Amino acid sequence: MYKCKFVLILFFITFPFFSYSNENATGIIKERMEKFQESKNLMRAINKNLSDSNFNVITQSAEKLNKWANEMHKFFPKGSEASSTNKSQASDDIWSNPEGFKKAIKTFEKASAKLIKISKNKNINDTASSFREVAASCKGCHQKFRN
């Protein structure tokens, strides 16, 4: 019985990763999806290291997020829209509202730059507040520009 429960739990934990994997994506779409996965991992690392007050990891992760913010626009050329075969979650609004998308990226870029600066002061409350701004910029963009 224990083995059966373990297998079921393992299946339900890993199944979402298979269903949303980028194995069908190629080229710029695959690269974009990998960059977003890396960004997600960096956000998790920052969140974890806030509780440990590990400002070096927080700053390094914020620097990587800021680098991604500055190059993100290059990963959304025309023709890289979402389709049923590439598993991209990019909304058509990215291409129909390019100014809005640029503004959302700029918000992320500014928030991540602020996090770099604030985390260097090693004040946990200010750093946590700045991290929430970065997270809000991600959420805001995803709500508007992700399917």
Predicted regions: what they are:
Residues 20-23:
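Boundary of Sec targeting at the N-terminus
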Residues 1-7:
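Bacterial N-terminal signal peptides that target proteins for export
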Residues 26-57, 63-147:
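Sequence context surrounding c-type heme c attachment/ligation sites in exported
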Residues 14-18:
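N-terminal signal peptide c-region/cleavage motif recognized by signal peptidases
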